[in-house]
Every structure is written in structure tokens, then in C-alpha cells.
């Protein structure tokens, strides 16, 4: 079956075609990054209008790439939430109108479930079960995934998401939009331990996380640098050092929490998904991940166990239609109820987990 996927939750318009027998047939994406850059962030009204302009051309582009026509589409999947209300409505209205015209089922998809399943689009796919780290600008959550639709929330950020902390810290440092990616780039030139920031909740027994205090620590460091220099300008190397220290702190917390999740579940496979999954430092750190089962005092230590870690292809780390088409196809195959028109801007992932 050929499923058309539509993503419009924020500032990317994504359309893709997924074939349940042949895999991903085509994938088209338009980013609004340049349009929002002059405002320093996403402007919801502009985002909605641009989605409306892009959806038809992107759909036709995907059909052309796949050598298919509208008549070949068997179902239409769309992002129902969470996201910007107007942006979601643009995609939902288009998906439902197209499905009605084609007399095909429409499949509402949770945006985060799309990210959760995106590594399954890679040539080398993880096997169930696995621990999933969803890490993006809006969410940071750790899940136990035992199969399609079988998810358990293990822990999440109690305040800022990791990606949000990246963006806000970048803004504190005066970096251009989108700041998170620029911060990661500058961190490559930072000196290790020139600054040392706290690792919030890293030693807590649970799998909850917090990043707002880390952002505050950066603000304090920036203010001290400016006061010492008698200038609002932060020296280039100092700025890079702050970026490095911030990134190291975030990645260390994420690594520690995921290791705890592996010990808690007994799983030895990790999937990382979401926009921050493109971060080079995160990929390097998780790529070398091992876990060691705790032993009673005085007993020989267990050998470290290697962990299999999977990331989605870079093209599917950010918002995209391919993950929505895939998630929709999986639910269509399992007989999920379809036909919901409404959008859900504040849809918690906890509502679809066990």
C-alpha cells in the first residue's frame, strides 16, 4: 500500500510516499528557516501561510519522483499534533481534503511517534525492544519501545527540553538563528574544561531530567565574562569554550539517563531521534556507549556490555514527511481507527503510551 505522509507541525513542510512493500519511494522537504531568521524565531502566522503554499507543489514533486499518480495513493497520513495550531491545521485540512477527493482513509499521526519510529527508515534497522531517546527543541523523553504502538514513558525533562536549552543558550551568546546548530558548531573549537557547568539531576535515581538550571549557569558565566572585560562583547575563544562546556554537560546528562534506562529495562539497544539527534558530539558519545551491571561490594565486577545504538539518517532527524508516512503505514497495517480531522497542538505523548 502506498501512503502519503504530510508534516506541518512547525517550520518545515514535509511530504513523502511510503510503500509497505518497497519502502520509502520519495521524500520532499521545504524549510522555512531563512524566512524566520530575520525575526529570530518562528512566526506562527507566516509558518501557516507558507505551509499552504508548499503542500501541493511538494506532493506533486513526490509523486513525480516516485513515478506515481494521485490515483496510486492508498491512504493519507498527517501530523495531528503536537505543534503550532495554525501550521497543523494547514496540513490537516490539506490531508483530509485530498483523502476525501481520492476516497481514501486519512491517518492522524502523533508527531513524536513519527520521530520515535524514524530510525526504522534506515537501511540498518534496530530490532525491538529498545530504549528510545527523543531529543528535540520541544521534547526530551526516554521511552521503552517494545513494538509499534507499544511504548512506555520512562522519564522526561521537567522543564526545558534539551533542544530548547541549546537554542536559548545560543541566544544568550548572541548567536544567529537557528542558534542550537551554530552552538554545536562552535563547541568543536572550544577547550575542554575551560568552563565547568552543572549536570542537573544526573545522580537522581529516576530518569527525569532538567536543563533550565544549566541555562542559568551559562547566563551567570556570560555576565561574569562581560563584567571582567568591561564589555558586552564575549571574546571568540571564550564563547567557544562556553559552547563546549554547555554541550558536554547536556550530552553527559543524556548519556547517564539512557544508561540507567538500559539497566532498568534490561535492553541493550538504543534509538536516538529528534532534531538534537543530528548533534555530532551526541552521536560520537552514544556510538561508544557501554553499560555495566552493578555488583555488590566485594564481588567481582561484571564486564562492560556493548550497546547497539541507532540514529535516523540525518535527513530524518529534523521534521519530515517520511516519518509521518511510515508511522501512518504501520498503523494502517495494524487496523488503527482512522478519519480524525481535528488537530491537537498540546497532545502529550503519554496519551498514546501504555
UniProtKB/Swiss-Prot annotation:
InterPro entries: ATPase_NBD, Gcp-like_dom, KAE1/TsaD, TsaD. GO terms for biological process: tRNA threonylcarbamoyladenosine modification. Its EC number is 2.3.1.234. Substrate binds at residues 134-138, 167, 180, 279. Its main location: cytoplasm. Keywords: Acyltransferase, Cytoplasm, Iron, Metal-binding, Transferase, tRNA processing. GO terms for molecular function: iron ion binding; N(6)-L-threonylcarbamoyladenine synthase activity. It is an enzyme of class 2 (transferase). The keyword Zinc does not apply. GO terms for cellular component: cytoplasm. It comes from the Bacteria. Binds 1 Fe(2+) ion per subunit. It is found in: Cytoplasm. Fe cation binds at residues 111, 115, 319. This is tRNA N6-adenosine threonylcarbamoyltransferase. NCBIfam families: gcp_kae1, T6A_TsaD_YgjD. The keyword Transferase applies. Belongs to the KAE1 / TsaD family. It catalyses: L-threonylcarbamoyladenylate + adenosine(37) in tRNA = N(6)-L-threonylcarbamoyladenosine(37) in tRNA + AMP + H(+).
